[in-house]
Amino acid sequence: MKVITTVKDMQQIAGELRASGKEIGFVPTMGYLHEGHATLLRQAKKENDIVILSVFVNPLQFGPDEDFDRYPRDIKRDERVAKEAGVDYLFYPSVDEMYPAEQTTKIEVVKRTNVLCGKRRPVHFAGVATVLMKLFHITMPTRAYFGMKDAQQVAVVEGIVSDFHIPVTIVPVEIVREADGLAKSSRNVYLSEQERKEAPHLYRSLCIAKQKIEEGERHPRNITTVVKEYIEANTNGIVDYVDIYAYPALTPLEIIKGRIILAIAVQFKNARLIDNITLTVQ
């Protein structure tokens, strides 16, 4: 595995690989890799000739009161996980390398962002879209892999790729969970011992909701009320949202039908956790 730190070198390597007919699988991350990331990397390894992993904590997607400075970083651990998963190139640029001058252009995402996490984080998806546009041009991937834990991000990225005719296939990968159901996340390290015991109730609430939908419940508010009440009864977290939308359009539903997402966000003392399930309902 080679570690690349400059845009020029990464772009040159990617260009030569594509020119020689190699298919590139790309996994963009902010580092502090866990089993969820490793799952993305292993799938990329199976489906492509070359795997490029990026580790870059992108300042543009953090708001002024968010945890950019506190976000966990451990590049040695990331290198170890990457090697074990068969990564060929680890792209590890500095902030100055990615943003050497003040941006003259940023991408504004106008759909799929005014709900769920985007509602509370107004700069987030503009930052995500901007850095991904840069990374796609730098790494020139055939396929790019994203975890469905951030299903809103997947929907936004699919929109960007479609709108700008970017020649990359987006591959969504199912959420990887701990044995007790908690979605794996770099931010789980922030949880206290008691919060870690409570956190699996997020996924349990989604499973209860799924069962009710399978039993015939079709009114979104009835489902979201059950989920909210369950979380409030079983955790000390504060429910940020419990919402049901059409997926990937992320538009409201009067009746649960078609492909839908049920998504939740819960604020614990030092960590805000998100989770979701997607279903196709007849």
Curated annotation (Swiss-Prot):
One BP term from GO: pantothenate biosynthetic process
Protein residues bound to beta-alanine: 61
Enzyme class, UniProt record, top EC level: ligase
Keyword annotations from UniProtKB, A to Z: ATP-binding, Cytoplasm, Ligase, Nucleotide-binding, Pantothenate biosynthesis
Residues reported to bind (R)-pantoate: 61, 153
Xref: Pfam families: Pantoate_ligase
Catalytic site positions: 37 (proton donor)
Molecular functions (GO terms): ATP binding; pantoate-beta-alanine ligase activity
Pathway the protein takes part in: Cofactor biosynthesis; (R)-pantothenate biosynthesis; (R)-pantothenate from (R)-pantoate and beta-alanine: step 1/1
EC numbers: 6.3.2.1
Role noted for this protein: Catalyzes the condensation of pantoate with beta-alanine in an ATP-dependent reaction via a pantoyl-adenylate intermediate.
Official protein name in the record: Pantothenate synthetase
Organism: Bacillus cytotoxicus (strain DSM 22905 / CIP 110041 / 391-98 / NVH 391-98)
